[in-house]
């Protein structure tokens, strides 16, 4: 029954029942974690063959001695595999070390210090400051980069086919201080939304007041399907070039959630001008990436189909966990109508919206009973969710029994926070004080 249809007395009685359920959670002495989208040990085990590669044969197919310096672009064979997966030409893709987030950080830093290919000056010299558009809910570590660098962040609502492009077009057309936008175009974090072709076309084609506006295209979940189908990649570089804005997209990806989260390979894609620009400055801090690690990945995968087959093994582990979360949330929260949640077809997260004004309270209640959940508001710039309703759930790391207990407990906390808030708002002013 919807909470809206309850009398004050019924709401008070329901609140008392949720208090009893919460007290039972307190007695369980839980220690459960839903915070980060980390691969489980079972998933990491899928890649253990990497630990014995490349063995004594340290040369790649081109004859490069991977043990030595050099090779800033990365190994051609591995670049070819991920160029196919990402829909990018090989010359437009370079392979780096383990962290695509590091690439993003460096490119923002390089832009601040030196300016980009189309920049009239270094961003740090812009008198009116720098602004970034941030689709919300979004990736907290993206927002941490721009916040650390003193870049103003503007939230953009996320729709079913991507961010609100009407609003984006309106903003970028008149404000030259808007230099970039964070994007996760496939199976977004945490929304699960995949940008439509039309959304991508408009983003690369739109007129911007800043000549050096950039799309930070974080394709972190390009092959991370929860079904048996892989998403079709939109050729963002090709569309941008056709629109006359070849330098607009910076494309990022990595194997962090494909092989070893701390020992994978990152990728940066862009126009040939952007590739040369990046390497010009990256070459000052490193003489080349870890090519031995790239070689082991090349041999482990073999080709793009090898990556796809590997990801279907991940899918077999992850899909039941995501289905379990949806099942528990449906059982516990559907009738009350105080929450909604995504059921993504890929990626690593579920976005849960609870009763507005109760997300922080829900997370605090969960923490007090030993259920760790990502901080409420983390998916928004400056950690400020204006509606205080969004909670990110990461199902990948816990075991299935722990995941069930954690989500069930989180649902109890959401229900308790909702009845508590409704009573305190005076929507049931005649209800007894049961707090």
UniProtKB/Swiss-Prot annotation:
Any one GO cellular component localisation term in the record: extracellular region
Catalytic activity as recorded in UniProt: L-aspartate + 2-oxoglutarate = oxaloacetate + L-glutamate
Xref: InterPro entries: AspAT_Ic (IPR024551), PyrdxlP-dep_Trfase (IPR015424), PyrdxlP-dep_Trfase_major (IPR015421), PyrdxlP-dep_Trfase_small (IPR015422)
Superkingdom, natural source: Bacteria
Annotated residues for binding of pyridoxal 5'-phosphate: 69, 100-101, 189, 221, 254-256
Enzyme category, top tier: transferase
Cofactor(s) of this protein: pyridoxal 5'-phosphate
One Pfam family cited in the UniProt record for this chain: Asp_aminotransf
Residues reported in the UniProt entry to bind substrate: 139-141, 392
GO molecular function annotations of the record: L-aspartate:2-oxoglutarate aminotransferase activity
Keywords tagged on the record: Aminotransferase, Pyridoxal phosphate, Transferase
Cystine pairings recorded for this chain: none
Keyword match tRNA processing: no
Outcome of gene disruption: Deletion of the gene leads to virulence attenuation in macrophages and mice.
EC number: 2.6.1.1
Keyword check for Transferase: yes
Summary of the function given for this chain in its UniProt record: Main aspartate aminotransferase that couples nitrogen assimilation to aspartate synthesis. Has a weak, but significant, side activity toward kynurenine (Kyn). Oxaloacetate and 2-oxoglutarate, but not pyruvate, serve as amino acceptors, while Asp, Glu and Kyn serve as the best amino donors. Essential for axenic growth and survival of M.tuberculosis in macrophages and in mice.
Protein family per UniProt: Belongs to the class-I pyridoxal-phosphate-dependent aminotransferase family.
Name of the molecule in the record: Aspartate aminotransferase
Species of provenance: Mycobacterium tuberculosis (strain ATCC 25618 / H37Rv)
